[in-house]
Amino acid sequence: MDFITKKILILVKTYPSLSKKYTELVCTAGMDEDGNWYRLYPIPFRKLSDEKQYGKYRWIEVKMFKNPEDPRIESYKIVYEDMKLLNKIPSNDWGAKSNIVLKKEVHTDLSKLIELSKSTNISLAVFKPTKIKNFIWKEVEREYPKERIENIEAERKQLNLFSNADENINDFKIVNKLPYKFSFVFEDINGKEATLMIEDWEVGAAFWNWTKHYKSEDIALQKIKEKFFDDYAQKKDLHFFLGTTRQFHNMGKNPFIIIGVFPLPKVVQNSLF
């Protein structure tokens, strides 16, 4: 097992998903200073102590090794107990963000990207849609399967006996299941239309925060569309961070989902070129 230590800029945090071993996990991905992608796991984010919880555009230093069980070339296991939080890029410093995010290839042809994922096992990419047509959602099951929750709770009780000091397990509650799936409808450079689900934590957090604030799911849904479509898609030079799931990487016709967004202000984009 060959460990390496890397400085990574966090770009992606997905909405938490259930895990039998870790209760729940957050898909976390970012780039090093040369613009190379890394997928970091396992990270039981909400169980980490406060001083180890990171936000987007935070540099972190991690000790990691390539997971031999995962064919996706960017996937690394980390020693999250040794993770160090470094400086954060200011929220309005889009030049500094772009210097990392746009350093390497920005994909515009979805079919070619899918072919590339099959031939080289790449599974993370920056993608620039040519036209964003809509932001949609559909209602799904509101609760996790009861049996799955029971299995996770039983496993957690055992694991808590050997919990790590860096994990904040007191009064930990499993994350609420999102009752909607959100997707962007867009065209690539060839005019090919696609509908891809977005699993960015920001979407889920916005749904719960606005539902609580307005006491209405319908208003919350419209507010989310205003942010991600009316603002990001219509007024910004929006890029997607695409990623594949391990389950469908080699199986799905299109294994990619949207795991994050990069809403670059157009004035910054113009100044870069």
Label every model-predicted segment.
Residues 2-68:
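N-terminal ordered "arm"
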Residues 50-56, 64-65, 78-79, 84-94:
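Compact, glycine/acidic-enriched structural inserts
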Residues 26, 58, 74, 236-238:
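Structural beta-strand/beta-sheet cores of well-ordered domains, especially the beta-sheet scaffolds
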Residues 15, 22, 38-41, 54-57, ...:
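Sequence-level detector for tyrosine residue identity
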Residues 1-3, 89-273:
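Nucleic-acid-binding small beta-barrel platforms of the OB/S1 family
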